[in-house]
């Protein structure tokens, strides 16, 4: 029966009772046969039996008496097969009735052993019983033995002989089943609760664990004896297919072999029991049956795995679920889809921001059904068949139709690896020749694509809703800002940058300098007549500009000094945007007065006195885009980008810039600088030989000398570059390369790192223009190799980090507008010593204020409570000298399974307030994970400085923080607030002890002797502050201080890593991740509630569990916050589907089944797995309950049932603007 997934609220998993398994089944599989080798038809009662599993051919019974759909539902009287669709072979199950009960390996072998906990027996003893090595007492009767006591065969016989009837012992799964059935769960639970009040140490831990499992059985209606199976389900045959290969051989799923072994052994056991065979033989057969079932469920979990041909272990049912190739990750979370294709990409400079070039053959294939429909509608083909034939023959009509079919039908382009959401964007297809897809040059940065052979995948959204979402939400022209920091991600690069740089360069003394034009058109005529050059500095009458250009009245009466190139550059900007004359932020308000002269003033004198204005570099072009986006939003910005791209390509071509050997200048001072360095090194070596300095000091000084020499050469080199040198222009404009590349070309390569990461003190004095000696070349190879292998490792590590981050935060969605939280977070600039890591401006921009902020001088209110801090407000706050602002934060959000709009603030990708339904958790994970590949892999070594520990940085440091591991070189933290009274050094055992006297108690800490202190004697220290240098362990910090302090510390530490590498990631993304690590608490004392001590639970669940106790005036439970690493936090989620698809699949499912867990389907992953629309964005329930409302005779706009309907964006006609 088909289930409509969109109708159900939650999904439960539980243990299956034997009757349940029989009720699923359509018949018992009695024989190990699969198919007949001659007829290739399924054997009767075998693993592929058509009577049990349904017909192999659609609507046809096995013997062929009934064929066609009109007999649907009839069971054939000859062969007993029901006439129905062959699809039922994917859903109908069978079963095997076992001759002896068998334990389920998941519940016996998992850690902790669930059976062992219920029975209070060790897994070792269980194994002996199950595999027939020992007997266990079931009923002692009068015998002098305990229940559940183990005994050998000899002891058993002895007791049986003596005590006969009352005494009962057994072995194998039967004995276990009887013991489990005899457990009185309620009594056992009461006893354990009593025991918990006295027990301590290991005993207590064991009792808590047992109570946990027993309570789980009590609450879930599962019976412990169901962990032992009498019946085994047989999964549908089409899920374990058998296919014929060429040459008559068969390939079969491993499961068929495993089922065959079970059936063979089961049938043999039945026969032996019928024959009344000797006990030892029956026992052996039962053990073999147990092992066969173990192998079927989880091959290799116990003992050696059962191997198939070629000694390859067979894949059991558990393996079908596990890992990247398992059911969860391969088929449920990521499926292959139709209407998709992939091809090599090539640059398409002729495209608009919202277009991509689609090769004709791909277009025909992807839009085939659409073309067929259109051909038949237009009567160009009589029916679908002839339309198909026309397409195959590439008829002329097809091309005419194709143009119209793809018009306004957006497609999605994706490039792997998809590190952030901009890895999939929508475009309107434009037909191109050839076989390569054409990509707009400006979106390459978001995709991290280049055109050296990269391939991309294309997908066609089919339904109207999908097309609407692609157009309104995913069109590439709308993705101007990066979600990680709100800065433009589509900025011109390479050719486009150098073209605009060349265009806006000024040069003194160019032809036509000092001419004054009455309008831009006049300047254009002069340029076309070669009277002036782009670089010529000229004057222009300000009054000739349109009235909407922001000039003051005074400026309009004067003449503005600019360059011809800048006049042309400004034409691409919106008409009311300020004239950009210099690369400065102030120019965004209007042009500075210093660029104007009165009519009649001598322009040549002015030009002689003023210096050249810098050309526009890459960073400034980015600033222009950001400013235009802020003022005019998406449409205007994407049009500007296209104009800037075309202008850049045009002018870089015109400039004729090339790079040649002659542009790499030789530095005349180089030999003298090297000579000087050599003599300094000689002096240092002499000092070492005389024993005046140690070897490590000598090494340090030598490396310092060479580093300094390289720096001098670098400075001299920059001085010697002409501004017109193409290599200098390329670097200065930000088009390609940086200064160190050019120092290696023309200066010296400098010191290289050896294989161990230590710097080799012999420098490479040559540069690439002179060429390296063999020795220098060899020294250089170490670094190059390390670089290559580091990059490969980094990519894998970074990808895995992103996966864990996504998993822990995937259910964080903006769920409401406000949650009335009364707590905020006070933020200041993040400092590292004296340097600013992240300024206050960055931290408060786009957030909501928790408290009103007043100007300390004038007492004027700058921003009110719950008001957004935008750029202007943030500037005011910083300029007023305010150092700390309390903002609404994700840390203090009280929204369950997500955050509220006010806690999160601005959506960085749009620059607007975030909308309800935004999947901020996934965006946060991608924003932290995506730059992961740019972080370094190495730990920095402080070059032999005494007491300087190696500091972990880059990717390893981020992992250390988010996995809540004990950091390397951990600092001790003070557990009290007080004064440091004594610091006592103890050279004998190389330690020093620090005594801190607090108000109530005194603490002493022992530290290594070499450690660097952060405080001296007599200094005040606060609780939770580090005594010595080094990273703090966040778990210790949480124990000593509160959640918020710990969260803020972790945020600061992660920001330090990213900002030091020049990567900007917004605080709010990191806040989302850290909050997920701290959303659990551990129950310390259950009070008078039903909670169990030691239980790990969500804060919201804990509050709910405490409510009844508080209302009735009973003692509530107490708990303390727990910091979980992201892997652990992802596995501890309330959704078993999400956890099982992440890691440790069998463990998660075992636990969920025993507890009878219910998955509330609140996150994204669990909904993707069951194929339900995800509850984020347009899939949110609120946005899906839209009804038409009738007003009079006309149907008005659809209206949502919920309060938050106002947050639904109006579908403004984004697309139309691009067609203009």
From Swiss-Prot:
Question: Cellular component GO terms, alphabetically?
Answer: DNA-directed RNA polymerase complex
SMART domains (alphabetical): RPOLA_N (SM00663)
Q: Where is the signal peptide?
A: none
List the CDD domains. RNAP_beta'_C, RNAP_beta'_N
Q: What does it catalyze? A: RNA(n) + a ribonucleoside 5'-triphosphate = RNA(n+1) + diphosphate
Sorted keywords for this record are:
DNA-directed RNA polymerase, Magnesium, Metal-binding, Nucleotidyltransferase, Transcription, Transferase, Zinc
Give the note describing cofactor binding and stoichiometry: Binds 1 Mg(2+) ion per subunit. Binds 1 Zn(2+) ion per subunit; 2 are expected compared to other organisms.
Biased composition, class Basic and acidic residues, residue ranges: 1207-1220
Disordered: region residues: 1197-1220
User: What's any GO biological process attached to this entry?
Assistant: DNA-templated transcription
Q: Which domain of life is it from?
A: Bacteria
Q: Give me the residues that bind Zn(2+), please.
A: 61, 63, 76, 79
Q: Which InterPro entries match?
A: DNA-dir_RpoC_beta_prime, DNA-dir_RpoC_beta_prime_bact, RNA_pol_asu, RNA_pol_N, RNA_pol_Rpb1_1, RNA_pol_Rpb1_3, RNA_pol_Rpb1_3_sf, RNA_pol_Rpb1_4
Q: What is its EC number?
A: 2.7.7.6
Q: What molecular functions are annotated in GO for this chain?
A: DNA binding; DNA-directed RNA polymerase activity; magnesium ion binding; zinc ion binding
Q: Which residues bind Mg(2+)?
A: 450, 452, 454
Name the cofactor(s) required for activity, per the record: Mg(2+); Zn(2+)
NCBIfam families recorded: rpoC_TIGR
Cross-referenced PANTHER family? DNA-DIRECTED RNA POLYMERASE (PTHR19376), DNA-DIRECTED RNA POLYMERASE SUBUNIT BETA (PTHR19376:SF54)
Described function: DNA-dependent RNA polymerase catalyzes the transcription of DNA into RNA using the four ribonucleoside triphosphates as substrates.
What interactions and quaternary structure are annotated? The RNAP catalytic core consists of 2 alpha, 1 beta, 1 beta' and 1 omega subunit. When a sigma factor is associated with the core the holoenzyme is formed, which can initiate transcription.
* Similarity field: Belongs to the RNA polymerase beta' chain family.
What is this protein's name?
DNA-directed RNA polymerase subunit beta'
* Originating organism: Leuconostoc mesenteroides subsp. mesenteroides (strain ATCC 8293 / DSM 20343 / BCRC 11652 / CCM 1803 / JCM 6124 / NCDO 523 / NBRC 100496 / NCIMB 8023 / NCTC 12954 / NRRL B-1118 / 37Y)
